[in-house]
Amino acid sequence: MSEEKFPGKIEISLAVGQEWSKKYKESPEGRAKDSVNAYLVPLESLEAVLKLKESLKIDAARAYKGINEQGEQTLMFVGAKKNEKTGIYEDVFLEGDGDLATAVLYDGTRPCPPFGDPTTPV
């Protein structure tokens, strides 16, 4: 998606979603033995990022891929704010509490498989 049109159209039909999913699953990355097709994202993670809209005036969120301590692929979310001079969405971070008294990212996702819906049409 081009940043000039960001965010653009955010809803797609199930048929389009199925086609995109099929393309991914047929790609070299999607065919890999340890391929992750989706992520289960707890509402708590999404709500934490959405709260950044008020506190940090974010325009968007960015998801980074990583591997956690359990060896699972995961997504880590950060807020992003558009730099009007450059047009680039820059990551912004909120300070954590207690043990996380530093810039924080939001996690909690689980890879699919194994945490997927076996009956999904996507």
Identify the meaning behind each predicted range.
Residues 1-122:
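Detector for the mature cores of small, proteolytically processed
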